[in-house]
């Protein structure tokens, strides 16, 4: 092998080395672009999943709030119904007492005048009973027992 052959071999190996380096650069660039594209797609997908999760959470919270308000409304209606029933029973009892008092006052010629006031858990009664020249005034506040 002469000096010319050595230069040709050296040039040839240098060309092969440059070509290998260039192909390696192209492959690395292609892999980098593919990795970046995969990373972009993964970021987008994570955002989509996060939005779906936030939407699900909001729907669950709205459903929970709706259930709670329905329970509160139902409890309120039941409490109102119980109080109304109690009020109606007391009003009926007051009317019965009034009928008997009026009958009694009519038959004994006693004049009875008064009024009552029914508040949340109290019955305020004011009565004035007159029998001839004698008069009696009664004012009383009766606490009513409440069953919860």
UniProtKB/Swiss-Prot annotation:
This protein's record includes keyword Repeat: yes
InterPro entries reported in the protein's UniProt record: IQ_motif_EF-hand-BS, IQCF
Gene Ontology terms, MF aspect: calmodulin binding
Keyword field: Repeat
Domain of life: Eukaryota
Keyword Repeat recorded: yes
Domain IQ: 11-40, 67-96
Pfam families for this protein: IQ
UniProt protein name: IQ domain-containing protein F5
Organism listed in the record: Homo sapiens (Human)
Taxonomic lineage of the native organism: Eukaryota, Metazoa, Chordata, Craniata, Vertebrata
């Amino acid at each position: 092998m002469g000096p010319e052959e050595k230069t040709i071999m050296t040039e040839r190996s240098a060309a092969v080395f440059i070509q290998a380096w260039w192909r390696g650069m192209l492959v690395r660039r292609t892999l980098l672009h593919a990795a970046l594209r995969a990373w972009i797609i993964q970021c987008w997908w994570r955002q989509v999943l996060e939005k779906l999760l936030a939407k699900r959470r909001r729907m669950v919270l709205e459903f929970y709030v709706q259930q709670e308000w329905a329970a509160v409304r139902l409890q309120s209606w039941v409490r109102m119904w119980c109080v109304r029933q109690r009020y109606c029973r007391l009003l009926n009892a007051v009317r019965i007492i009034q009928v008997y008092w009026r009958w009694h006052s009519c038959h004994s010629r006693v004049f009875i005048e008064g009024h009552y006031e029914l508040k949340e858990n109290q019955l305020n009664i004011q009565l004035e009973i007159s029998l001839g020249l004698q008069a009696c005034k009664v004012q009383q506040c009766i606490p009513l027992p409440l069953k919860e």
